[in-house]
């Protein structure tokens, strides 16, 4: 509760109090666990507006090729990835998957979050989940550890604190625009003639977790196991198994976890 939280100052990326280097975030997470005895994980934000820095092969803060220690630390603290949300879908891009007609779902590829830096095609491979999984396998061959072996979730990222993504209970998209007849065209960000208009924002998605019971501890454990998946709205039940020792009964088993 509050007593535990008071032992740590909240992490911030704003300098000089904070840092936008992911290594410093990982150190903070480690410190939280050591000081409070609690358990934490980080879920990486949808990287489709990262302009190629979400899944790097070279550390942006050092300019050096990612090495074993970075791969181990990232895989430890970031088991999950937000693959879809209000600001576009981050699974695949038509430039990377030209033969997949589903790869152009809710594509946001004008630039970074505030549109101050335009998007270039050579950035795309390092910010979409499908190509990141491939990069992770390539890095595992070199390092023995895969930093991008993540589970996936979806979320709204609408900043409203409301669970209202369903059509029967929809309160609107981003909190930056008040309800009104012109909200559909209100830009979330704009630089010159480039802008993210209100109508272009997505209303999905959802995070699904296979947990043994509906408790915080069980849900946290399931997330650490990566027994999760993302949807863009439908509340579908999906399970995927990979291995050699399953039988036909396992395919029909609806028991979670």
Feature annotation, model-predicted:
Residues 1-257:
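Extended, charged catalytic domains and RNA/DNA-binding interfaces, predominantly
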């Amino acid at each position: 509760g509050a007593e535990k939280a008071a032992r740590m100052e909240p992490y911030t990326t704003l300098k000089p109090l904070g840092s936008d280097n992911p290594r410093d975030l990982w150190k903070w997470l480690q410190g939280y666990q050591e000081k409070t005895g609690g358990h934490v994980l980080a879920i990486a934000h949808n990287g489709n507006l990262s302009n190629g820095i979400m899944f790097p092969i070279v550390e942006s803060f050092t300019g050096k090729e990612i090495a074993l220690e970075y791969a181990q630390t990232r895989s430890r603290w970031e088991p999950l990835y937000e693959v879809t949300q209000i600001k576009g879908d981050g699974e695949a891009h038509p430039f990377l998957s030209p033969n997949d007609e589903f790869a152009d779902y809710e594509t946001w590829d004008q630039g970074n979050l505030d549109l101050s830096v335009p998007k270039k095609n050579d950035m795309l491979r390092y910010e979409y989940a499908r190509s990141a999984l491939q990069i992770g396998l390539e890095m595992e061959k070199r390092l023995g550890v895969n930093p991008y072996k993540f589970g996936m979730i979806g979320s709204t990222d609408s900043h409203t604190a409301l669970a209202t993504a369903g059509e029967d209970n929809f309160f609107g998209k981003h909190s930056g625009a008040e309800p009104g007849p012109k909200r559909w065209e209100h830009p979330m960000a704009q630089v010159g003639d480039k802008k993210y208009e209100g109508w272009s924002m997505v209303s999905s998605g959802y995070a699904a977790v296979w947990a043994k019971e509906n408790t915080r501890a069980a849900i946290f454990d399931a997330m650490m196991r990566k027994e999760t998946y993302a949807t863009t709205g439908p509340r579908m039940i999906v399970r995927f198994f990979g291995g050699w020792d399953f039988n036909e009964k396992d395919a029909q088993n609806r028991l979670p976890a």
